[in-house]
């Protein structure tokens, strides 16, 4: 190896880095502890008919000419200039006689080796000797030390030397040392605590929130990918002309096209972009790092590109001329500490070399990598054409996403560079055409015709064809089709006698049983609309629903004691009396487009809202499912869902329309897997339809108690909440050929709107996907600006088609807010978040607002907060849902110290829950009540919900009542069982099983141990009586007699 002494002298041996260089190097160090990533710029150029000696001599001249190439980048964040340095002979790979495929492989291997190298050398050079007297020059620069214009200058000077022209002398006052000291001295004058500096930082939006598939720190290696867009000289000049016409620079025009594309893939109107600006006016001809990054809040969407680009020009100029210098290293550190949205700030960058360059040679290949940059766009002029270089760390992003973004950028660039383009026109859609095509095809699948029947009509047709077939089984009771129809007609007659007319609303308020089904069929036969109102909620709330729905008649069960009227506004009719009335001879004529039922869901203002569903909307869903899964007369469903939960609509009308059988459990057995297994095995149930948590409970119980019940189920349909990734395989452990169906939708869209048949569950799945729209239903994934989101981009799920509700009963404002009519199509804004996969599959990503699902129930946290704030002495309350998939409710309360009584005892968690039980259904009462002095706040002064979530993990004991010790033998017995199941923990009378760490699996184990000890406990009892004190009382009541215990 030849070694030549570097000839230049440098005034100092140690030079501090600038803020920008510190940031680049520190980010690189963070990501290179165990990974392979460095900051570099790499270029390849071909040189024809030039000898290797000539090329080596010219390169050596340039390296000797620039002091920076003699430096070493050390671990102490300094550049060191040794007194004696050496230039190594350049590596050579002779491929002059190689075959083309071997040359291609060798060049690819060279690129891979060079780009993955962790070398900190300032410059690395290699030759590849190719056929036809061509030398491929490979040059890698350390970009912490050498910026983009310096790379350009390097190759310009090489061209200059090869043409025989000497290099100009360097000005001894224009040095890297002078520049670094100048920049660092300016930084010393910046007050990082000043209001102006902080004002700038706090007003910056987050970087584009692009979809990712992994965190960069977890990458073992990083492959940088370069993609290029070339704009012809003619189109480039047209773009420049139009830009100048509108008083914007071409650079801002290109950056604004970039921000428009980033806005669509990031689902945000405003985003932070890093401009890498090189200020070299006083340092012309020097190679070094002169970049001063500028963070600019850019607009990504306006009504027209003209307004967008003008806005961005203004924002850029304001940032560039800001009266307080904003150093990038300090900016990034500040932003990273503000919120999670700034976890990776300034990771997308724009830079350009449009003013001073026109490369005579075009690079054969190149790329640019930086540890703190995920995606960069660099604009240069090569041979009079605009070349836009996209460099991306593709491993961070979903496959082909950057390629799709590039295509959308190209389309918009091409449009804006047309000769007579009008930039004031509305921006076109940038959704890639192939994505739009896939979605249109999926949204039009299926040949199901819109039904012209009523929801109950097929049941009554089946009565004629199979009158003696079993319609309902409930324990030891059963009804055949003709008897059920007779009861329904008599019920309709009784309703008519009570003054019910076609279109009236009639409430059904009774516990689960045959009466519920008789009631809804009777109401529909009478031409009325059924309104299920659960008994499991305070009377005050029930009556508010009755009044809001304009209900006069309420069908009840004669044995339900909760249905005692508080006034004479309502007429209560028990179904047992109703079926003794004179039957209605023929059904009331109603149009299929008219309402069939109204289901009331939680409302954010504290008032429940009534979802109005038509006959044809609900029946369309039932028919689609029945046809898809060939539901018929031999099928039986275990109907677990409450009547006010719309899964019950399919349980009733899906099965009765197909000639099948409904198998019921009692109200107390709705959470009892013992009863479910018995019913499944005894009555040969073939179908399961519930929220995932209940099916999980069934499988868990079956495993613990060796039940074969799951093997009876040929079809399992789960919806209403997250579906565990383990459930499909656990089900198929019982039935290999079983069909496992994931479904989703909204009450406002007729039960379900999408379906997915789950076969295998790939390891990379985050959750079971939503799948595809049902026939005559459509989906869109829409961002906050009303644009269709590209693949992988999270947006709000909109449902369209024939299942859309008629609106919210007697609430035009809420209806207009959630139901939209666009270009002749009706859409319901679900408030759910989702995204498309490239094949058109929909993935559910959770809620976007304060609505949550707990145990399958849709709950508005705002309604809970209204109820909490109604409690005397409460200054402010916040409700949250805790947990990822299996959520529970928690409430945080700050008491009003001025209004709260001083003498009386303070409000405790148990009292709060008792007061809430008077206003809300039991499933809406938070399990955890935590009292605070003040609420934690974000940097923007809003309640910090993430901090509250963290508190729930530390404050489990505060959510329970005053810790009274365990006294009775029964309580001690319960505590021993709980400790055996949950592990040793301190328990009190008020200790709650589920707040003490119990889950569904643990609950089943407790029931199992109770049985062994001689207590015939049902699982539902533990859910209903979940404290030590309450469960001990129930256990005593369930003690078996000695001979029964012996038999057990």
From Swiss-Prot:
Pfam families in UniProt: AMP-binding, AMP-binding_C, Condensation, PP-binding
Protein's job: Bifunctional protein that plays an essential role in virulence. Plays a role in both the production of the siderophore anguibactin and the regulation of iron transport genes.
Any Gene Ontology biological process: secondary metabolite biosynthetic process
Signal peptide: none
Superkingdom of origin organism: Bacteria
Keyword set, alphabetical order: Activator, DNA-binding, Ion transport, Iron, Iron transport, Ligase, Plasmid, Transcription, Transcription regulation, Transport
UniProt-listed InterPro entries: AA_adenyl_dom (IPR010071), ACP-like_sf (IPR036736), AMP-bd_C (IPR025110), AMP-bd_C_sf (IPR045851), AMP-binding_CS (IPR020845), AMP-dep_synth/lig_dom (IPR000873), ANL_N_sf (IPR042099), CAT-like_dom_sf (IPR023213)
GO cellular-component term (any): cytoplasm
GO molecular function: DNA binding; ligase activity; phosphopantetheine binding
Protein name per Swiss-Prot or TrEMBL: Anguibactin system regulator
Species whose genome carries this gene: Vibrio anguillarum (Listonella anguillarum)
Pathway given in the UniProt record: Siderophore biosynthesis; anguibactin biosynthesis
Family: Belongs to the ATP-dependent AMP-binding enzyme family.
CDD domains referenced in this protein's UniProt entry, alphabetically: A_NRPS_TlmIV_like (cd12114), ArgR-Cyc_NRPS-like (cd20480)
Carrier domain: residues covered: 965-1039
NCBIfam families cross-referenced by the UniProt entry: AA-adenyl-dom
């Amino acid at each position: 190896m030849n070694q030549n002494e570097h000839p230049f002298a440098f005034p100092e041996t140690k030079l501090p880095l600038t803020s920008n260089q510190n940031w680049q190097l520190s980010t690189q160090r963070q990501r290179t502890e165990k990974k392979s990533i460095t900051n570099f710029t790499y270029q390849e150029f071909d040189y024809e008919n030039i000898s290797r000696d000539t090329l080596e001599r010219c390169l050596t001249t340039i390296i000797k000419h620039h002091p920076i190439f003699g430096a070493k980048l050390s671990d102490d964040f300094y550049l060191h200039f040794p007194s004696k340095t050496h230039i190594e002979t350049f590596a050579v790979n002779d491929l002059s006689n190689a075959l083309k495929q071997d040359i291609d492989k060798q060049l690819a291997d060279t690129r891979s080796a060079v780009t993955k190298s962790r070398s900190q050398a300032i410059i690395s050079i290699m030759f590849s000797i190719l056929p036809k007297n061509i030398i491929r020059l490979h040059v890698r620069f350390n970009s912490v030390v050498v910026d983009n214009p310096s790379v350009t200058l390097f190759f310009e000077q090489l061209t200059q030397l090869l043409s025989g022209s000497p290099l100009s002398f360097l000005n001894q006052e224009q040095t890297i040392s002078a520049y670094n000291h100048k920049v660092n001295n300016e930084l010393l004058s910046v007050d990082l605590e000043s209001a102006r500096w902080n004002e700038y930082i706090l007003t910056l939006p987050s970087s584009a929130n692009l979809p990712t598939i992994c965190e960069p720190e977890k990458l073992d290696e990083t492959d940088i990918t370069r993609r290029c867009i070339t704009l012809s000289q003619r189109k480039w000049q047209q773009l420049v002309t139009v830009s100048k016409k509108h008083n914007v620079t071409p650079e801002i025009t290109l950056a604004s096209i970039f921000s428009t594309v980033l806005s669509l893939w990031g689902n945000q109107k405003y985003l932070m972009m890093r401009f890498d600006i090189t200020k070299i006016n006083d340092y012309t001809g020097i190679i070094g790092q002169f970049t001063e990054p500028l963070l600019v809040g850019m607009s990504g969407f306006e009504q027209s590109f003209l307004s967008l680009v003008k806005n961005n020009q203004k924002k850029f100029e304001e940032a560039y001329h800001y009266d307080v210098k904003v150093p990038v290293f300090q900016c990034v550190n500040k932003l990273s500490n503000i919120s999670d949205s700034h976890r990776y700030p300034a990771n997308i960058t724009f830079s350009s070399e449009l003013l001073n360059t026109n490369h005579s040679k075009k690079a054969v290949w190149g790329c640019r990598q930086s540890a703190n940059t995920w995606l960069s766009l660099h604009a240069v002029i090569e041979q009079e054409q605009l070349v836009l270089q996209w460099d991306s760390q593709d491993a961070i992003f979903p496959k082909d996403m950057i390629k799709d973004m590039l295509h959308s950028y190209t389309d918009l660039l091409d449009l804006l560079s047309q000769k007579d383009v009008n930039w004031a026109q509305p921006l076109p859609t940038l959704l890639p055409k192939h994505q739009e095509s896939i979605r249109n095809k999926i949204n039009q699948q299926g040949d199901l015709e819109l039904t012209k029947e009523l929801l109950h009509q097929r049941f009554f047709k089946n009565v004629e064809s199979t009158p003696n077939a079993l319609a309902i089984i409930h324990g030891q009771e059963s009804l055949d089709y003709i008897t059920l129809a007779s009861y329904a007609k008599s019920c309709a007659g009784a309703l008519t006698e009570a003054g019910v007319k076609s279109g009236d609303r009639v409430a059904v308020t009774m516990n689960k049983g045959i009466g519920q089904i008789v009631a809804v069929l009777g109401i529909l036969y009478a031409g009325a609309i059924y309104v299920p109102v659960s008994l499991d909620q305070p009377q005050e709330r029930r009556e508010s629903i009755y009044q809001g729905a304009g209900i006069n008649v309420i069908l009840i069960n004669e044995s339900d004691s909760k249905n005692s009227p508080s006034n004479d506004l309502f007429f209560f009719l028990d179904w047992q009396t109703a079926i003794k009335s004179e039957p209605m001879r023929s059904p009331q004529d109603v149009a299929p487009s008219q309402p069939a039922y109204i289901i009331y869901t939680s409302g954010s203002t504290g008032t429940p809202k009534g979802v109005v569903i038509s006959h044809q909307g609900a029946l369309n869903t039932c028919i689609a499912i029945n046809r898809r899964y060939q539901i018929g007369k031999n099928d039986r469903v275990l109907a677990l869902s409450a009547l006010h939960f719309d899964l019950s609509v399919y349980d009733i009308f899906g099965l009765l329309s197909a000639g099948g059988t409904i198998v019921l459990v009692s109200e107390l057995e709705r959470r009892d897997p013992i009863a479910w297994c018995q019913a499944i095995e005894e009555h040969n149930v073939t179908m399961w339809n519930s929220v995932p948590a209940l099916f999980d409970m069934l499988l868990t119980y079956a495993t613990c108690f060796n039940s074969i019940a799951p093997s009876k189920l040929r079809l399992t349909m789960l919806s209403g909440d997250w579906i565990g990734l383990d459930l499909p395989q656990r089900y198929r452990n019982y039935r290999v050929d079983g069909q496992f169906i994931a479904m989703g939708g909204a009450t406002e869209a007729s039960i379900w709107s999408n379906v997915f048949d789950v076969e295998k569950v790939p390891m990379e799945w985050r959750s079971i996907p939503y799948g595809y729209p049902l026939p005559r239903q459509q989906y869109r994934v829409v961002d906050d600006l009303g644009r269709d989101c590209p693949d992988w981009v999270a947006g709000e799920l909109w449902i369209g088609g024939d299942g859309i509700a008629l609106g919210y009963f007697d609430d035009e404002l809420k209806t207009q807010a959630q139901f939209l009519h666009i270009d002749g199509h009706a859409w319901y804004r679900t408030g759910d978040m989702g995204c498309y996969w490239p094949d058109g599959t929909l993935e559910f990503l959770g809620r976007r607002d304060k609505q949550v699902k707990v145990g399958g129930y849709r709950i508005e946290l705002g309604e809970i907060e209204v109820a909490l704030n109604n409690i005397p002495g409460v200054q402010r309350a916040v409700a949250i849902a805790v947990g990822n998939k299996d959520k529970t409710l928690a409430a945080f309360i700050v008491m009003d110290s001025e209004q709260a009584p001083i003498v009386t005892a303070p409000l405790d968690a148990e009292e709060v829950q008792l007061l809430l039980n008077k206003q809300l259904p039991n499933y809406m009462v938070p399990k955890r009540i935590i009292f605070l002095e003040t609420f934690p706040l974000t940097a923007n002064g809003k309640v910090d919900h993430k901090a509250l979530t963290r508190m729930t993990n530390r404050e489990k004991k505060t959510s329970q009542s005053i810790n009274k010790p365990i006294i009775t033998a029964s309580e001690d017995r319960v505590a021993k069982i709980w400790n055996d199941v949950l592990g040793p923990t301190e328990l009190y009378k008020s200790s709650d099983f589920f707040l003490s760490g119990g889950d569904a699996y643990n609950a089943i184990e407790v029931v199992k141990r109770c049985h062994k000890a001689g207590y015939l406990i049902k699982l539902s009892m533990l859910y209903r009586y979940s404290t030590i004190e309450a469960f001990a009382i129930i256990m005593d009541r369930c003690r078996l007699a000695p001979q029964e215990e012996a038999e057990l």
